[in-house]
């Protein structure tokens, strides 16, 4: 069976909660899947190989921890366990590459911050790099209540 998937990028922004809530609810309502993607971006520390290895291990452990936490939140919303994926590299490039790899991903779900600045991912992926994305980007407005997000996710059947 071909299940469409919703992709959410796990990062350190406040908007992440809104994106996860909407995407998990939409996935549940449409019997689709949910993918949580974390991209680890490293600084160049090649002259210090042992330090670089430690930094990579710590960054990966932190990404795994965050993904597990958000996976549990998504499960509590949708009743299904999301796929979790970790990539390493430039954030925008890795997101686009992953979308191109997984042909079942139908929507990239982002959330705006609700302030004057829409947030780093929205600025990058719904703005500068939007023409490079092979799927629609859904931007959830910032400042919505949890009930409004659930209503929005339910209406978009």
Predicted regions and their residues:
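Acidic, proline/glycine-rich short linear motifs
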Residues: 38-65, 148-157
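A short acidic, amphipathic alpha-helical/loop segment
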Residues: 19-22, 97-98, 124-125
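Gly/Ser-rich helix-loop-strand patches that form or flank binding pockets
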Residues: 100-157
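Short, solvent-exposed amphipathic alpha-helices that sit
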Residues: 22, 59-70, 94
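Small/aliphatic-rich secondary-structure junction motif
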Residues: 2-50
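Structural beta-alpha unit
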Residues: 75-108, 154-157
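General small-molecule cofactor/ligand-binding pocket signal
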Residues: 35-37, 83-87, 138-140
């Amino acid at each position: 069976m071909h299940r469409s998937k919703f992709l959410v990028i796990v990062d350190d922004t406040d908007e992440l909660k809104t994106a996860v809530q909407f995407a998990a609810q939409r996935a549940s309502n449409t019997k689709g899947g949910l993918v949580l993607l974390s991209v680890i971006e490293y600084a160049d520390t090649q002259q210090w190989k042992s330090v670089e290895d430690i930094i990579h291990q710590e960054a990966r452990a932190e990404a795994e921890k965050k993904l597990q936490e958000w996976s549990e939140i998504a499960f509590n919303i949708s009743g299904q366990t999301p796929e979790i994926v970790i990539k390493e590299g430039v954030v925008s490039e890795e997101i686009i590459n992953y979308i191109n790899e997984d042909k079942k991903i139908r929507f990239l779900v982002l959330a705006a911050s609700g302030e004057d600045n829409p947030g780093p991912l929205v600025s990058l992926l719904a703005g500068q790099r939007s023409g490079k994305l092979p799927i629609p980007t859904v931007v959830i407005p910032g400042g919505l209540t949890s009930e409004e997000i659930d209503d929005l996710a339910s209406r978009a059947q």
